[in-house]
Amino acid sequence: MKNNYKSLVIVGSQWGDEGKGKITDYFSQKADVVVRFAGGDNAGHMIEFNNKRHKVTIIPSGVFNPKVKNIIGNGTVINLKSLVNEIKRLNESNISTDNVFVSDRAHLIFDWHALIDQLQEENRKENKIGTTKRGIGPTYADKAARYGIRICDFQNPNFKEILKENLDYHNQIITKVYNHEPLDFDVIYNESMTNYQFIKNNIIDSGYEVSNLINENKFVLFEGAQGVLLDIDHGTYPFVTSSNCSANNASIGTGIHNKQINKVLGIVKAYNTRVGSGAMVSEIKTELAHKLRERGREYGLNTGRPRRIGWLDLVALKYAIRVGGIDQLFLTLFDVLDTETKIKICTHYKLDGKIIDWFPASDYELKRCEPVYEELDGWNQDITKVTSFEELPINAQKYIKRIEEIVKVPFLGFSVGSDRKQTILIKGEFDD
């Protein structure tokens, strides 16, 4: 596996859960650095190798390679309690976290953020977003409103007063808007200081560090969270996450300039899934959805919620490619379709009787869209042991080629199982 450039951004091209962690782990075997640039511990990544499965939520997926420096960038939001627990859990599995570093500019998730997240979701009644209730949205809201507290604020001699003022403000919302009991300051302060002491020696200026490494010709992987269709600006609003998930945010969420980004790889599942509310044009409403869900183990890593299942939506994928800046694609969970004799791909939408090939902005419009399908022959045989594109059944090869023809972007590779070894490059190297 050759690498002809200094940096690669890996993003999800659907509604998350595409297998970004597995592909990041695969490429991290040749990387010097892996950076998480957005999201929080709401994004669970599952990595499998040597017959063991490992889950990470906020720590970059490169942590399983001891030679890789792993950086949690300034664009993330960090729950220190979750981070410390994740570090301890990895250490208990004999995985070193000495190579994990945290940006001093990252914003912090506190107990009040998670509580407000929960109370807001309950207040929405039938219009729920489907949030994980981990405080991600309220933390990003505080960041924009300039109420946020960053990791570097721990060094301020007035940190205790800053924290108290912040909690007092949020307790007003908790008690007067939601009629809930206030949170206790001493508990939050003591816990925060304990967790800060645990990670303080691993706090860095992520932008300074990553920029220097790129200038030294080190290979840097940028690991995205969620997917482009959950992007706060370009996703299916309001049923989105609270951060920017596209490659455009990799530089902002790390602290470098966008000219230091070379390539963008979009991870695309062989079918569509979605957690929570919001339109999903190609959703399967038959028993087939349950069958594919079980074959693909399509349940949330953090919440256990069953994911909604749909045929691959190429209208949405073309949109994600455009706004996500995607140069190449990587197909995952390809083997889940092994048992299907007929496979559909959504090539267009029908909106109010008109055929369209563009992705509507509003959930109201998307819910009125009907899928226009093209049906392909399946391969109906096990592909989990193939080691090259040429070993795939002809119809599986045709599936990949047909997607490429429609979206006009090539596949770099595909995955036929959960193990690291079941990851196959089509061309054997990264394209220039």
From Swiss-Prot:
Principal subcellular localization: cytoplasm
- Is the Nucleotide-binding keyword given for this protein? yes
**Positions annotated to bind IMP:** 17-20, 42-45, 132, 146, 226, 241, 305
Which residues are annotated as active site? 17, 45
Where does this protein act, in terms of pathway?
Purine metabolism; AMP biosynthesis via de novo pathway; AMP from IMP: step 1/2
Cofactor binding description: Binds 1 Mg(2+) ion per subunit.
EC annotation from Swiss-Prot or TrEMBL: 6.3.4.4
Q: What does the record give as the reaction this protein catalyses?
A: IMP + L-aspartate + GTP = N(6)-(1,2-dicarboxyethyl)-AMP + GDP + phosphate + 2 H(+)
Answer yes or no on keyword Transmembrane. Answer: no
**Where on this chain does substrate bind?**
301-307
Q: Pfam families from the xrefs?
A: Adenylsucc_synt (PF00709)
Give the top-level enzyme category: ligase
- Binding of GTP: at which residues? 16-22, 44-46, 307, 333-335, 415-417
Q: Which cofactor does it need?
A: Mg(2+)
Sorted alphabetically, which keywords does the UniProt record give?
A: Cytoplasm, GTP-binding, Ligase, Magnesium, Metal-binding, Nucleotide-binding, Purine biosynthesis
Any one GO CC term of the record? cytoplasm
Q: Kindly list the biological process annotations in GO that this record carries.
A: 'de novo' AMP biosynthetic process; IMP metabolic process
Gene Ontology molecular functions = adenylosuccinate synthase activity; GTP binding; magnesium ion binding
State the protein's purpose.
Plays an important role in the de novo pathway of purine nucleotide biosynthesis. Catalyzes the first committed step in the biosynthesis of AMP from IMP.
Q: Which family does it belong to?
A: Belongs to the adenylosuccinate synthetase family.
Provide the assembly information: Homodimer.
This protein is called Adenylosuccinate synthetase
Q: Which organism is this entry from?
A: Mycoplasma mycoides subsp. mycoides SC (strain CCUG 32753 / NCTC 10114 / PG1)
Q: Which gene encodes it?
A: purA
